[in-house]
């Protein structure tokens, strides 16, 4: 079951991850000065991850290579255009998420690899993943486990060779991960924005947080379409 590898690994490292990065975040936050869309529900698809999967296995002819080149160009232009349209506030959240998710991935590389290897032997739907993540986040309120979950889900996206299905997974999981606790953590790190109306601050920040998580997978998308 999916719960075996997620609960037995992510949850086991929650305290270590929280204790290891919260102080760093508080230290760096003191220097951080410059910083009605409805998402479609994903299909009930099954994921099977295999770290030995090589994209070269799918590029056997010249036509395959040319099509991949065209696909990469079009996708990259679209991603770049979407990124340029984001407001400064959202980009500041992207920077924060990138920095600390990368830190978690690097500092806990061995632990993450254990989870990735276990995931490579399992088949499960995106709803299985979402349910387990939701349970974990309800039981654990720390920032570390949320950053670890983003890093973990992003890596699963790298190992799934279907970009369309992976985007759907990111869409659903971004809503689940971006709960009130995560919004509070990120907004505490980020400098205040006086342009946000007080009456809708939380709703606005939650929407911005979801958008930021989606674009925090920017490098992953480039990896998949490259």
Curated annotation (Swiss-Prot):
Plays a role in evading host innate immune response by inhibiting host inflammasome activation. Interacts with and inhibits NLR-mediated interleukin-1 beta/IL1B production in infected cells. At the host mitochondria outer membrane, interacts with the BH3 domain of host BAK and prevents BAK from binding active BAX. In turn, host apoptosis is inhibited. Induction: Expressed in the early phase of the viral replicative cycle. It is found in: Host mitochondrion outer membrane; Host cytoplasm. Belongs to the orthopoxvirus OPG045 family. This is Apoptosis regulator OPG045. One of its GO terms (cellular component) is membrane. Its main location: host cell. InterPro entries: Bcl-2-like_sf, Orthopox_F1, Poxvirus_F1/C10. Keywords: Host cytoplasm, Host membrane, Host mitochondrion, Host mitochondrion outer membrane, Host-virus interaction, Inhibition of host apoptosis by viral BCL2-like protein, Membrane, Modulation of host cell apoptosis by virus. It comes from Vaccinia virus (strain Copenhagen). Homodimer. Interacts with host pro-apoptotic protein BCL2L11 (via BH3 domain). Interacts with host NLRP1. Interacts with host BAK. One of its GO terms (biological process) is regulation of apoptotic process.
């Amino acid at each position: 079951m999916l719960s075996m590898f997620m609960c037995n690994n992510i949850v086991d490292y929650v305290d270590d991850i929280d204790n290891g990065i919260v102080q760093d975040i508080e230290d760096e936050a003191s220097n951080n000065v410059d910083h009605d869309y409805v998402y479609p529900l994903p299909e009930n698809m099954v994921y099977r991850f295999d770290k030995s999967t090589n994209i070269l296995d799918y590029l056997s002819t010249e036509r395959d290579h040319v099509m991949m080149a065209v696909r990469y160009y079009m996708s990259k232009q679209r991603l770049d255009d979407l990124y340029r349209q984001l407001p400064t506030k959202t980009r500041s959240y992207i920077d924060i998420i990138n920095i600390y998710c990368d830190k978690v991935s690097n500092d806990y590389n061995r632990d993450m690899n254990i989870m990735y290897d276990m995931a490579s032997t399992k088949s499960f739907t995106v709803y299985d993943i979402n349910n387990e993540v939701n349970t974990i986040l309800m039981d654990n309120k720390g920032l570390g486990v949320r950053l670890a979950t983003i890093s973990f889900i992003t890596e699963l996206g790298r190992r799934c060779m279907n970009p369309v299905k992976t985007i759907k997974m990111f869409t659903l999981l971004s809503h689940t991960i971006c709960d009130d606790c995560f919004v509070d953590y990120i907004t505490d790190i980020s400098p205040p924005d006086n342009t946000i109306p007080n009456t809708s601050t939380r709703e606005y920040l939650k929407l911005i947080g979801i958008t930021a998580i989606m674009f925090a997978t920017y490098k992953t998308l480039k990896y998949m379409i490259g």
